[in-house]
């Protein structure tokens, strides 16, 4: 499987302070992990559920 490039991006909470539970793909660990999204900006490596993260980034 050729990974999408956004799956390699680090978790990016962004500058806002909402602390919304979200998931990102941890490229080094090769798995989806929880992080807290601030609610604005950030990057494309952010998913509302672990299942969506796995579908996008896990082989």
Swiss-Prot record:
> GO molecular function: any one?
potassium channel regulator activity
Q: Which cysteines are joined by disulfide bonds?
A: 7-57, 16-40, 32-53
Q: What broad class describes the main subcellular location of this protein? A: secreted
Q: Which PROSITE patterns match?
A: BPTI_KUNITZ_1 (PS00280), BPTI_KUNITZ_2 (PS50279)
* SUPFAM superfamilies xref list: BPTI-like
Places the protein is found: Secreted
Question: BPTI/Kunitz inhibitor domain spans which residues?
Answer: 7-57
InterPro entries membership: Kunitz_BPTI, Kunitz_BPTI_sf, Prtase_inh_Kunz-CS, TFPI/VKTCI-like
A single GO CC term, please? extracellular region
Q: What does this protein do?
A: DaE1 and DaE2 are serine protease inhibitors that inhibit voltage-gated potassium channels Kv1.1/KCNA1 channels (IC(50)=300 nM).
Miscellaneous information on this protein: Neither DaE1 nor DaE2 affect Kir2.1/KCNJ2 channels.
Q: Which PANTHER family match?
A: KUNITZ-TYPE PROTEASE INHIBITOR-RELATED
Assigned protein family: Belongs to the venom Kunitz-type family.
Q: What is this protein called?
A: Kunitz-type serine protease inhibitor dendrotoxin DaE1
Species of provenance: Dendroaspis angusticeps (Eastern green mamba)
